[in-house]
A protein has these predicted regions:
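Intrinsically disordered, low-complexity regulatory segments
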Residues: 1-163, 167, 452-453
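Amphipathic alpha-helical transducer elements in NTP-driven molecular machines
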Residues: 10-17, 34-37, 41, 77-88, ...
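Basic, low-complexity terminal or inter-domain segments flanking catalytic cores
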Residues: 2-4, 80, 91, 119, ...
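C-terminal or mid-to-C-terminal helical accessory/interaction module adjacent to the motor/catalytic core
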Residues: 72, 94, 136-220, 255-259
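Short, polar/flexible loop-turn hinges at active-site or ligand-entry regions and domain interfaces
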Residues: 72-75, 103, 123-127, 148-155, ...
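Conserved short loop/turn motifs at secondary-structure junctions
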Residues: 1-2, 102-105, 182-184, 255-264, ...
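Metal- or metallocofactor-binding catalytic centers and their adjacent structured scaffolds
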Residues: 150, 233-266, 272, 530
Length: 680
């Protein structure tokens, strides 16, 4: 039997081809024996913008809302049409007995294949390759146990409902709020509640009023004990005067033995959080790196929400620990069949043991080392310690001293790779100290402190907040998935940054002035983290066949009706032409939005002179016009690649990187000639 295989991207297709023997390169696919392998280039087809349903939607009018497609249209982008035509021809071919969906084993991978399959109007029976590793053995095992494609109908339904909900809320909400408030406001099903979390935290920080407090600290015989906080400095002065130079007595010594189990293995969100905490990586940066490690067969499937492995993987993990070092006896700590759905936790592969990680360097080496470290740490014994609370009495006043005795370092003894190790601030308990012991003389000192505001979010803490969003509103046994999914949270953060609503300052991620203004107009139910988290749970139930797509979409429709009804009651604000423009990035001089004009790409701040001119002397000499994509790249990366610069001296075109530098608030260009083209 001859069969067709469609992977998500060329690199995965090549890995599959080597296993099943498709070595012959053709235009857009590989062939060999009884199989042909092609690929999708990621999302080949996306839902069409409103104007493709009706030309009147090219102009934004509140009265046209809501836009509710009766029949959803999928469009293939111009730069992918040629490859789609190859796929369509293959999918319609009568040479094949069936087609294998080899796209990523998850919600989005299912949608990528199904959309292409549907657009091609293919009648081929579908089988599903579902694997958690790109190792040759895993691929072969997957082909030996292909699933019926129909088993994943519910997964596809959940993916389509998610995409349609995002489209309906995004397209209608953005147009509605933009037209009503006279400035462009981007609305998103997950983006808006996330921005609301950031602005709420920022408001608490900005409105926080620090208040002084006072303590008295007494010292004697190696003991340092402190009083409770006092609001009045006079009370602290009185206590200090009463105790200074006096004797004290150890009143009580309370000991509490505690255990802290080893942390679980990495799911994607936890890996992103810790890579941000230890290395400062953004969530999208970590996702990109771990995806590359997966495609290079060094780690297992990364877009997982599980921190466990199944029982049948115990020997595999024991073999990994034997190679990398670790307590194989502790593997049972991370085994839980009930907590593994589509994919187990992220692990290094057995292939990585054979190949080694010596070829890795830089950021890739750090992320791989972090995954190995977490595997080793997860099987370690618990951290066992003793909290000791000592009460000291002086002049009828009570002071306390806190100590911590480490009884077993356990998993905490493993240092984080490539990271500066944190020094413990805990003090060990003085062994000679006994209850009733008299301290002949103590010195007393007044200490002043101030209450502190909440900390600004980092990507580490924001990802944690997104993951746990709405938990308090759910029943105890409810499956909780928070805002977004492990696979989508990084993209949500990047969209907030690129829209100008959020900015990074060091490790902190903060709402911009534009973001604070935008969220102020949005009603609470659109900002609700618990409602959005409940939608994610509905999608999970849909994957299991417990919720009907029609019921989910009816709920989304009801939300749209409520939103538009509420907005109709609000007077329309006169439009601001600047904020009705689509921004292409942030100004490198002042940080405000950069918009496209007729002749240039200009900073929206009228006091800022920064602009990128479409026609400039520098580029005109090489017969080059600055395109929107080039300008976007320059703002984001400081450089852009093009292959049609013209050399008058040689009378031919050439490829190079156009590099931007800022001098006195203006853009200056230069060319660089890398050995390999910069990423577009």
């Amino acid at each position: 039997m001859k069969y067709l295989v469609i992977a998500e991207k060329p690199s995965v297709a090549r890995s599959i081809s080597k296993v099943i023997g498709a070595y012959k390169h053709e235009d857009g696919y590989l062939e060999g024996g009884d199989c042909v392998v092609s690929w999708c280039l990621g999302h080949l087809a996306e839902y069409a913008a409103p104007e493709y349903y009706d030309e009147r939607y090219k102009s934004w009018r509140f009265d046209d809302l809501p836009i509710l497609p009766e029949e959803w249209k999928l469009l293939v982008s111009e730069d992918k049409k040629a490859h789609f035509n190859i796929l369509r021809k293959l999918l319609r071919s009568k040479d094949f007995d069936y087609v294998v969906n080899a796209c990523d084993a998850g919600r989005e991978g299912e949608a990528i294949f199904r959309r292409v399959y549907g657009l091609a109007d293919s009648k081929l029976p579908v089988k599903r390759l579902w694997i958690s590793s790109m190792e040759d053995s895993a691929i072969q095992q997957g082909f030996d146990s292909l699933k019926d494609g129909a088993e994943y109908d519910n997964l596809f339904a959940a993916s389509e409902c998610r995409a349609k909900a995002d489209w309906l809320i995004g397209m209608n909400g953005t147009r509605a709020f933009t037209k009503k408030y006279g400035r462009r406001q981007t609305i998103g099903r997950v983006q808006t509640p996330t921005l609301a979390m950031l602005t709420e935290r920022q408001n608490k920080i900005q409105n926080f009023v620090k208040e002084p407090y006072y303590k008295v600290e007494i010292t004697g015989n190696g003991i340092v004990a402190e009083s409770e906080r006092m609001a009045q400095e006079q009370d602290a002065d009185t206590m200090q005067a009463a105790c200074d130079g006096q004797c004290a007595v150890v009143g009580s010594i309370e000991r509490k033995r505690k255990e802290q189990s080893a942390p679980k293995l990495y799911d994607l969100t936890t890996l992103q959080r810790e890579a941000n905490r230890y290395y400062g990586f953004t969530a999208s940066q970590t996702l990109k790196i771990v995806q590359e490690l997966y495609e290079e067969k060094l780690v297992t499937y990364p877009r997982t929400d599980s921190q466990y492995i199944t029982e049948d993987m115990q020997q595999t993990m024991a073999d990994l620990l034997k190679h990398y070092g670790g307590e194989a006896d502790g593997v049972k700590q991370v085994v839980n069949n009930k907590k593994v759905t589509d994919h187990h936790a992220i692990l290094p592969t057995l292939e990585s043991c054979k190949r080694g990680s010596n070829s890795l360097s830089g950021d890739k080496e750090k992320v791989f080392a972090l995954i190995v470290w977490k595997m080793q740490q997860a099987v370690q014994p618990p951290y066992i310690y003793e909290d000791v609370l000592v009460t000291v009495c002086c002049q009828d006043r009570k002071f306390t001293a806190k100590y911590k005795n480490v009884l077993q370092a356990g998993h905490t003894a493993m240092p984080v790779p490539f990271a500066e190790q944190e020094k413990s601030k805990d003090m060990a308990f003085p062994k000679k100290l006994e209850q009733g012991e008299v301290i002949p003389v103590v010195s007393a000192e007044k200490k002043q402190g101030f209450t502190s505001p909440p900390k600004a979010f980092t990507e580490d803490t924001l990802l944690s907040a997104m993951e746990s969003a709405g938990n308090k509103e759910f029943e105890k046994d409810t499956e909780k998935k928070g805002l977004g999914t492990p696979a989508t949270r990084a993209a949500i953060l990047e969209k907030l940054v690129s829209s100008g609503y959020v900015e990074r300052k060091g490790k902190q991620i903060l709402p911009s002035a534009e973001g604070v203004t935008a969220i102020a107009n949005i009603p609470d139910y659109l900002k609700s983290a618990s409602m959005t988290a409940e939608w994610e749970n509905e999608l999970l139930r849909m994957e299991r066949g417990e919720t009907k797509p029609a019921d989910f979409m009816q709920g989304i429709g009801g939300l749209l009706e409520r939103m538009l009804a509420d907005l109709r009651q609000i007077p329309t604000v006169q439009e601001s032409p600047i904020y009705n423009k689509v921004s292409i990035g942030n100004c490198p001089v002042c940080g405000k939005l950069v918009c496209e004009g007729k002749l240039n790409f200009y900073c929206s701040d009228r006091d800022c002179k920064f602009a990128l001119w479409k026609e400039s002397k520098y580029l005109s000499g090489m017969k080059k016009t600055l395109t929107k994509k080039m300008a976007t790249d320059l703002l984001k990366k400081g450089r852009t690649y093009a292959k049609d610069f013209y050399s008058a001296k040689k009378d031919k075109t050439f490829a190079a990187d156009l590099v931007m530098a800022i001098e006195n608030g203006r853009a200056q260009y230069s060319l660089e000639f890398p050995k390999t083209p910069a990423k577009k």
